Amino acid sequence: MRAVLETADIAIVALYFILVMCIGFFAMWKSNRSTVSGYFLAGRSMTWVAIGASLFVSNIGSEHFIGLAGSGAASGFAVGAWEFNALLLLQLLGWVFIPIYIRSGVYTMPEYLSKRFGGHRIQVYFAALSLILYIFTKLSVDLYSGALFIQESMGWNLYVSVILLIGMTALLTVTGGLVAVIYTDTLQALLMIVGALTLMVISMMEIGGFEEVKRRYMLASPNVTSILLTYNLSNTNSCNVHPKKDALKMLRNPTDEDVPWPGFILGQTPASVWYWCADQVIVQRVLAAKNIAHAKGSTLMAGFLKLLPMFIIVVPGMISRILFADDIACINPEHCMQVCGSRAGCSNIAYPRLVMKLVPVGLRGLMMAVMIAALMSDLDSIFNSASTIFTLDVYKLIRKSASSRELMIVGRIFVAFMVVISIAWVPIIVEMQGGQMYLYIQEVADYLTPPVAALFLLAIFWKRCNEQGAFYGGMAGFILVVVRLTLAFAYRAPECDQPDNRPVFIKDIHYMYVATALFWITGLITVIVSLLTPPPTKEQIRTTTFWSKKSLVVKESCSPKDEPYKMQEKSILRCSENSEVINHVIPNGKSEDSIKGLQPEDVNLLVTCREEGNPVASLGHSEAETPVDAYSNGQAALMGEKERKKEAEDGSRYWKFIDWFCGFKSKSLSKRSLRDLMEEEAVCLQMLEEPPQVKVILNIGLFGVCSLGIFMFVYFSL
């Protein structure tokens, strides 16, 4: 019987919605959303606490509450391996990848590939692949999981609830940008952890403790006789009714169908490297940090938080099987269809069933808010990151002279487009809902991502890797992926009570071993082709590899014919219409003579003037192709249209409100840009500086979190 929302539940859910929207509008009011950096990277102003919380909830979405708990109910501790693996890979992001991304001065991961290898074909390939993954895998999983929870626990109309959630999330993302996303993620992290911990404590008290969970889980089998009498089934066969013998182990033997340890280490880990170290959703948050110390602190915080899902999601899923074995462990497809509407199995209802049966009125509203928080967090992450990739890696290739205002508009329009796609996808999700969809999407992600992970690792750790090697290696991996996916969908797994007549190479080779082969084949082809073709230029590897030296100063030039001006960090250059310097500011009393001995290769920031007087800003010698006449802190301020301010001043109140609502601050931009840019954070390279004491503290934290992660792997695998 489905629960009915009580007044207290409705009040708590409504209060949550009000809080989220207030935070979003607060971000609109306080933050600078009128520039690419301000909207997409929160102006590089976020602290480690906010980013760490955002990293956690960006990953732990509604599909984790449904999927992790469901997998815990079906197969025990195994699924927790992904969480402990993420704990370690987050530190790889903070200590290895993020310093390189900051030094390169990039906003997006396709942009990094373009700077590292040159050209645009790898950039476009990776951008398209990322958008496909976001829209048709992450988005579909989130909507399926959220819809399943809403249907199971609250009985809301599916379409109305999903459309409402998508619409609110899109409004929050469009208006506030990454600042709003990170601020709301901080609230959602607190809400999710408190709610999930509450349910864990209640369920543990019901069972009698963690040791009792392990003992009773191994006995949690459905009563087949009672089920056959109760449901009047025509099919009396039963399958998969008993817990697996190694359910209490995490990493299992090489032939295990869930987590074979060689496949997990050699295949799943590279796939996870892509997600945690090269996925726009994750990396974009860390790039919003004030400096490298805050970036590392955020990955440490997120790493410690990743210890929680094993205990607040997976274990409650196991408890749900203990308490409701006749439903969660349905005995055959006919029984499963009657219980949860899916012939594939009913383990996905483990968490919603636990909420509705154990949680009292009032707290049930809190748990509903937790699930809404998880769903909205994932959706706003996808909306913001996908719009960033589309705007900066696809649209700017089509419209190279696009202004900053135009890029902001396009980013918001693309979010609206994704909302339409999301709503159109709902009927397909309804038709596909069941355990199989979630599992298939996880498998698809493991097929698509290992080749990309191989390219990123080689790009960062091997200077000799070039564009030809990366492109042909990536294409070879992609062709293999398409072949394997085609075979996987052509030969679908049979229902549990039917014989498996699929070919041996489909039936008996675990997808993690396929991911292993894809990763190493892509890497091998990339290495061979790179060695047979010319090496990359020094400019391509100057700031984009692990071995790059830290650039210390800024080079700025206002004429392609003259010698470049060499300037201090936080310097600002302004040009007249005839390409002459009219304002050359060097703070702290430094003179040009003090830096003239530096070589061009020591310089990272370049600003050059075109004949029409608009400089072209470049970081790491990669043209941004946006007309500017001031550049600082890795952020270009649009100044080319000097007469446009009259238009803004003369506009109606309606258009002024629209400009404020969407973050377009064209009015008085030319008057405020110099002062504001002088007051901003140091340029990207200055962000890499760490005080010695802070560095020691961070390294101690690194040792602690990595030790905990390894201990958890060992403890749950023995």
Swiss-Prot record:
Modified residues (Phosphoserine): 594, 632
Membrane spanning residue stretches: 10-29, 39-57, 87-110, 124-144, 158-183, 187-205, 304-324, 354-376, 407-430, 444-462, 511-532, 696-716
A cellular-component GO term for this protein: apical plasma membrane
GO molecular function, one term: D-glucose:sodium symporter activity
Record carries keyword Ribonucleoprotein: no
Localization annotation: Apical cell membrane; Basolateral cell membrane
Bilayer disposition of the protein: Multi-pass membrane protein
GO BP annotation list: inositol metabolic process; myo-inositol transport
Keywords: Cell membrane, Glycoprotein, Ion transport, Membrane, Phosphoprotein, Sodium, Sodium transport, Symport, Transmembrane, Transmembrane helix, Transport
Function summary: Electrogenic Na(+)-coupled sugar symporter that actively transports myo-inositol and its stereoisomer scyllo-inositol across the plasma membrane, with a Na(+) to sugar coupling ratio of 2:1. Maintains myo-inositol concentration gradient that defines cell volume and fluid balance during osmotic stress, in particular in the fetoplacental unit and central nervous system. Forms coregulatory complexes with voltage-gated K(+) ion channels, allosterically altering ion selectivity, voltage dependence and gating kinetics of the channel.
Family recorded in the similarity comment: Belongs to the sodium:solute symporter (SSF) (TC 2.A.21) family.
Protein name as it appears in the record: Sodium/myo-inositol cotransporter
